[in-house]
Structure formats: C-alpha cells, structure tokens
Amino acid sequence: MQSCGRWWGRLAARGAPRHLRPAAGGPRRQQQRWGGGEAARCIEQLLPRHDDFCRRHIGPREREKREMLSAVGVQSVEELMDKTIPASIRLRRPLRMDDHVVENEILETLYNIASKNKIWRSYIGMGYYNCSVPQPIARNLLENAGWVTQYTPYQPEVSQGRLESLLNYQTMVCDITGMDVANASLLDEGTAAAEAMQLCHRQNKRRKFYIDARCHPQTIANYTGVITELKLPHEMDFSGKDVSGVLFQYPDTEGKVEDFSELIERAHQNGTLACCATDLLALCILKPPGEFGVDVVLGSSQRFGVPLCYGGPHAAFFAVKENLVRMMPGRMVGVTRDANGKEVYRLALQTREQHIRRDKATSNICTAQALLANMAAMYGVYHGSDGLKDIARRVHNATLILAEGLRRAGHKLHHDLFFDTLTVTCGCSVKEVLDRAALRKINVRIYSDGRLGVSLDETVNEKDLDDILWIFGCESSAELVAEGMGEETKGILSTPFKRTSKFLTHQVFNSYHSETNIVRYMKRLENKDISLVHSMIPLGSCTMKLNSSAELAPISWKEFANIHPFVPLDQAQGYQQLFKDLEKDLCEITGYDKISFQPNSGAQGEYAGLAAIKAYLNAKGERHRSVCLIPRSAHGTNPASAQMAGMKIQPIEVDKNGSIDISHLKAMVDKHKENLAAIMITYPSTNGVFEEEIGDVCDLIHKHGGQVYLDGANMNAQVGLCRPGDYGSDVSHLNLHKTFCIPHGGGGPGMGPIGVKKHLAPYLPTHPVIKIQTDKDACPLGTVSAAPWGSSAILPISWVYIKTMGAKGLKHASEIAILNANYMAKRLEKHYKILFRGVRGYVAHEFILDTRPFKKTANIEAVDLAKRLQDYGFHAPTMSWPVAGTLMIEPTESEDKGELDRFCDAMISIRQEIADIEEGRMDPQVNPLKMSPHTLNCVTSSKWDRPYSREVAAFPLPFVKPESKFWPTIARIDDIYGDQHLVCTCPPMEAYESPFSEQKRASS
C-alpha cells in the first residue's frame, strides 16, 4: 500500500497544474540511449505509452505514409532519402542524443530545471523592468494559438487583425514619443540603437557617430564601417561636419533627466542627426523627445505588459521624423484601400526591405517582434492614456519616497531629477547593504566604482519600499517617509520637464478598458487572421510546422518569465542548464563545436557569423579578405548581412537546374582568391534541391583561404540525415522559429543562434554586463543583442521539441517533411511545371511551381493564384521568390495527407479555372482569380453582376463549407495607393463609421 500510495502521489503531481505541484526534486533518472533503436524493454511492452509526442507532431499516419511513398515511386522512406540526398553527405549513424521523453514527463523534468532559477525582486533597471501582465492579454493573446501561429502579414487580406493591432502599436509609439512615424517593432533596444546609427550614416554618408557614455552599456554597440566615440555632451564637437549622428539616453542609465536641447541644436547646425533612446512609461509624464527636435527615437516597450524573460523576447520601438521614413528599418504598417475602396491595412514601403533591396536594404533584419508588439499595443489599449499616466505617476512617486528615505538615512543621491531610477553612494558599508539585500532576496545594480542603482517599476508596493529602505539602513517606513514629504515634493511634475501634450486620444485607446471589451476586441481581431489553427500555411523557406501546446506551456512559467537578464548567474542556474543541454543537442545535430544563443533572429545570426569570420581572418593577419560570394538565389538577408559586416558582395550565377553554377563559382573564386573571405550558401538550396557538389564547393572555398557560411533556413530537411559541420561548413545560423518549433507569432519572435567549428569559437559574441565567453583564447566580436542569451524565454520551446522527439523522431520529422513535399510535387506535376528537381528527379522539403506561362496564356500572375487560394481557405505559398513569378511550397512534416490533398485539390481546381480563361469559357478580366479574394460581404450582397456564381466564388470545392470556411475580411489590396498615400497611424474615426452614421451626418 505504501508503494501504491507513493506512485499515486507521483502521478497526481504530474497531472496537477504546475503551480499546485509539491516542491520539485531532481529530474527523473533516465537510461541514456542513442537513437532509440534497440528493442523495447519488457516493462515498456506491458505499459505502452499513449502520449508519445512524435506521433502527435508528425501528421501522416502509417497508412498515409505508405500511400504517399507509392505515389512518388519508392518502396520506403529510406529509399526516398537515398534518391534525394547525396550519398557523400549522408549521416550513417543515429544522432547521439537521449531517447525521447513523453510530453507529461518532459514538462515535469523541465519544471525541475526551471525551479533552479531563483526569483528575487530585481531593481537593476538598465532597460528591463518588472511589470504587471494583464491576465486578459496573457490568456487571450500570448497563450492563444490563433495569435502565436500566424505568419508575417504579407497577405493583408487574411491578416487584418494583427495589422490593426500593429498599427495601434505604431500610433501608441508616435503619440507617446511625439514623433511622426514609427515602425512595427525591432528586435531589442540595442539592435534599434545600431539601426539608428546605420540610418544616420545612410542619410548623410558620414562615418563618425557619437554615443553619450551614459547610455545603457548593452546599447553601446560598434558596427563595422562606422566609427563610434563615447563622449559626454559637452565634449562632442560637431564643427568638422563629419559626425553622422549622436545617441543619448533620456532618462539616462543612471536615472538622470537632462535637457538635451542645446546638444540637439548644435548637432543640427552641423548636419548631424539626433537619436534618443528613451522609456515609454517615463514619457507618459515626461516631455517627449519629439517636442525638443529629436530625429530618431528608440527604446524597448518591454515594460508595457511583457515579462522580463531573462532578456527577451521584447519588442523595441523605433520612430522618426517624416523626412526619414524611407530610411527607416523594419516593417511598417500603413493604411491603404481595397478593391472596393474600403480603408484597410497593409505592410507599407516594402521596397526598403531586404527581400527586395538585398544588399541595399535599410536593414538586414527580416524578423520583428510582432507578438510582443501586439502585447504592448494591447497594454496601451487596455489602460489608455489616463491609466498609463496613473502607472507612471505611481512609479515616480514610489521613487520620490525612496529618494527621500535614502537622503534621511545619510546616503548621497547623484541626481536630483529622475523618473524611476536612483544612483546612490552609500553612507555606510556597501557590503552591508548588499548582505541585507541578499537576506530580502533583492537585486540592485552594482557599479564598478561602488555606487548602487535602484530602479522601481509598476509592481512595487509599500512592502517593497519598506524592504528597500531597510536594506539601506533607513529606520523609517515608506509610510512615515511619505507623510513627512508634503505636497511640495512633486518631482518631474513641478518642473519644465512635465508633459503637457495629450496622447492616445484615438478612440481605440479609449474604448476597451473593461475586461469584457478587451477580450472581445482581441477575439474580433484574431478572427480576421488565418493561422495554423485554420489550415496549413505552405510558405516555402518558412517551415510553418506545429507549435505544440506542450512546447509553448513553459513560456509563461514564472520561473522562466520573471528573471532579470543581469542577475548573478547563481540565480539563473535553471536557464544555464537549459542552455547547456540545448547547445549539446544542437552541436550533435549540426556537427558544430560551439553555439551562441545571442542572435535574436536569423538575420542577426548571419551578421554574427559573418562578423566571426571577419574577426578570425583579421586575427590571422588577413584583414584584406573581404569578398563574400553569394548565389543569386540566396535569401535577401544574406547580401544585406554581408554588407553590414563590411564585406563586398560578388553574386554567383545559378544554373538551369537551380544549383550553383560551378563554372562561374570557380571563375569568381579564382578572380578573388587573394581577397576571398567567405561564401554564403543555403542548403538544401532555396530552389528546393540537395546540390550534389556541396562538399566540393566547401573544399574549393577552403582551398582558397575562405570560410563557408551555411544559411540554416532549410535545416528542417537535414536533421538526422546530414550535418553541415561534416560536409564542410564553418558556421551556420539556426532558425529555431522554423526547424525547432518556436512559433512565428505573426512576424516574431524568432531566434537565430549560430553554430561554429572550433576555430571560430573564440570569436562568438560576448556581453558588456554578463560574462558569457568561457574560451580562454576568446577574442570576441562584441555584442549583437541587448541580452546575453538573446530571447532566452522561448528557448524552452526548442528544448521540449528536441527532448520529446528524440534522435529517431527528429530524423523521422525531416524524412516526412521531404516525403510530404515530394508527394505534393507528384500530385501537382501534371498541372504545373515543377521548376527544379535533384539529379534523380526528387525535390527536398520544398519545391517551386512555375506560374509564369499563365501571364501569356491567360493574363494570370502568381499574385492571382495567391489571392484565389484564400477563397479555398489557404494562406498562399511564398510568392515570386526565389524566382519571380513563381510559388514556392513547403508543407512541413506536421500536415497529414488529408490536408496535403486539400491543398493540392485547390491548386488543381485553380489550374482548371486558368484553363477556362485560356479556352475562352471565362472572361479574361472578370473571373474568380482576378476578382479574388471574395469576402462575406461580397458574396452576400444583394448585387451580384459577375459572370460566375456565388458558389464558384466562395465554395469552389466540396471541402470549402459555409460552417467552417475562413473568410478574407477585405477585397484585394491596392498596394500602389498605399505607398503613394502613406499613413502609418490609426486613421480618423470617420473611417470606422457605419453607413447609417454617414447618412445621418449627411442629412443633418
């Protein structure tokens, strides 16, 4: 009975909600097995598991796999792999990893790891603050698959919800900062500062950039090609007219609020741009930078309802004067109209972005932080202007009380005017203060010169203030200090720095302050957007696979969410163990020797990897090597990243089969052999084939002194099958938001850690606050992200995916991704030309349909097919990339045969509609493709004058049913109008009026 009771207790604890479980002990001991290939033990045969994650993650059932294998003309998955992947690079052994763990057990194990993190009260500041995450937003947005599994809103007809929310974000940023135009977020504040520096350089072509030494240390960055100088404002000399821009922090990292008007005036007189890093909450009561002439404003919106997350993910904001809008990096939502003249939303000015401008893009960044920007936007919508001002005043008042108490206790405050941060020279022993802080489990900022910093936030209450006063030896309570302050202590509110301008006056920020209304508003927006909860999203090179509930569950655990990124490492041992586990597994999967988790996106990983190559070559005395070879079919981020890393780009041609043109490559290598730095290649190629000569390409580059950068965007076709580090690559980034299941979030977050071979390991990113390089020979390249380990809080997603799949499951996922793609290609090849195949006639995990001939035969283009697919309930494949006028399809391993067949049926049906146009049965101008997508308003309108039926428009195949159909909410977008009439803030209320309101106003 005792034994039964003990087992029942374990089972009950495993099934209980995490916060109700008993204190965690050590993780359950497991047998270490490589690849899971041995016969099952007797106990496993008697107690079969029903919660094996692999069969939940992989879509096709065994019968469906057999049917698909038969359709593509092979007997087994292994035969398909042999015919798809070059034999010279195949991995012929199992991955050396622990056997898979079932879902419930892995969450128990992960919670044991998370419990090693110590949740202290952190008042370290430096751009990271505790905040209260409104539960309606956490429950209905952050933890909602309808929001987190959306793709970037490049198809606006099925993305109006998140586009509206991101427009709210932009409007909020513009209003609070006093600027003209904002983008839809960047990766973090440090990245935003680097982007501001690049913007200044692009604007006036000057090479020098001043940085106020009182910026946050992680914000001070040095990018190749721009000379940065740390100076105080009075030391900055602009008379040489060689300074592109100046960056200052307001309030600064020590908390001081300072008037920068004179500095800005001096800068502008000499053609220098002024950039301000700031705090949105402070600006709710503080004069905004836009009112004293700043050109660029940036910062983090983390404290608007996003947890600390050990550094990320968080959305940075970026706003500029109107004259700089076309220089601005990142995505930007704008207002335009649809085919019916309705005011709608879209991504504006995309010609600035890397997928079009390539090496001349305004930024190499492809991923933003859409999910976190949406959380911050909803925080602003939920609280409104009055609510935000109340929160800001509360934080400021708490800081005033603390300041008064510290003065009474004999401590010196370094600044008289502040918002939420105090810098203190202790009147007693610093060690004594820190010892008392440890007793209360409180973290403060420790300066190298012995001063201490305390930054308060919206979560601080009276007890917190009492504890902080106690650790500094103050005998008075917060209540007694407050009573003695009197009305004359108003801080910012009694100075010229007090904000007098209104903000967030738009109705959207004044309508949803009850939980009922905010929940309904979020649901209304969610219902406008297609996501993985509706149907497959077959975007080539984007890997829109399952983001499982078990993987996503840990991101909101307080043990991961409530850790400041700059706490001592002994308070983050859970995170450190997770990083080590994940690094070990990723090194085994890729064949690399070392991983850096700092890059927040694939593009940032590209920059970090190329910068490591450049640092390595410089250390060898080969600084002259700067030429980077890039195939013309490469991701647009590749040339943009190479340009940012200070390299010169040499394009390489692609042959008719979609592979690198070897003869042209050899010619370019020979031409640039003295200056060759690297080649950037994607494998399998962006054309969807495993190139046979990949090993020879790597050998050729190495022979001539270069390094091989392998873009990891297509890693989903390689896991367990081949390893980049084995066939010659020196460095790769890994898109954890593709291959390793971090959701796309409607355009971010992402993670792009880089893996390197041993010789590049000393040149991985470091950090100015937390030491992360352990290599004794380290010569780090600097910092590429604000936080030491990037977006730490989403790494548990990839960790859970790898642990629950195990070596065997990971390999099988890649196999089924390839099988699914080949099955779809086989079904569609009779109706569309498959543009590229491997040497034995098979594709990799994605393939390209050539739709270019339809332009001549029926005046139909790829965009028409993309929009028509929305009527069938599908998001479009990748459009016009890597070949203009084509569609690239990637099904992933998570979709079952039924969903693949539905998509293929839709594409075949659309091909028949094109044939109807070609053969004169359908009008060449007014047809289901040209008029798509068809909205519910359109189909139910009393007026229908089109030469095809409503059924053809809205229900073209039997599986498209009224009760389950996803409806596009707007007609086709007018992109040209949107760029010609750029509006990037919420439109006036007249745009939201009903016809009844218009009639009423007209009659009056």
Curated annotation (Swiss-Prot):
Pfam annotation, one family: GcvP2_C
Encoding gene, per UniProt annotation: GLDC
Activity: how regulated: Stimulated by lipoic acid. Inhibited in presence of methylamine.
Major location (coarse): mitochondrion
A biological-process GO annotation: response to lipoic acid
Similarity section: Belongs to the GcvP family.
GO CC term (a single one): mitochondrion
The protein, known as: Glycine dehydrogenase (decarboxylating), mitochondrial
Superkingdom as given in the UniProt entry: Eukaryota
Annotated compartments: Mitochondrion
Organism encoding this protein: Gallus gallus (Chicken)
Reaction(s) catalysed by this chain's protein: N(6)-[(R)-lipoyl]-L-lysyl-[glycine-cleavage complex H protein] + glycine + H(+) = N(6)-[(R)-S(8)-aminomethyldihydrolipoyl]-L-lysyl-[glycine-cleavage complex H protein] + CO2
Key words of the record: Mitochondrion, Oxidoreductase, Pyridoxal phosphate, Transit peptide
Subunit comment: Homodimer. Interacts with GCSH. The glycine cleavage system is composed of four proteins: P (GLDC), T (GCST), L (DLD) and H (GCSH).
InterPro entries linked to this entry: ArAA_b-elim_lyase/Thr_aldolase (IPR001597), GcvP (IPR003437), GDC-P_C (IPR049316), GDC-P_N (IPR049315), GDC_P (IPR020581), PyrdxlP-dep_Trfase (IPR015424), PyrdxlP-dep_Trfase_major (IPR015421), PyrdxlP-dep_Trfase_small (IPR015422)
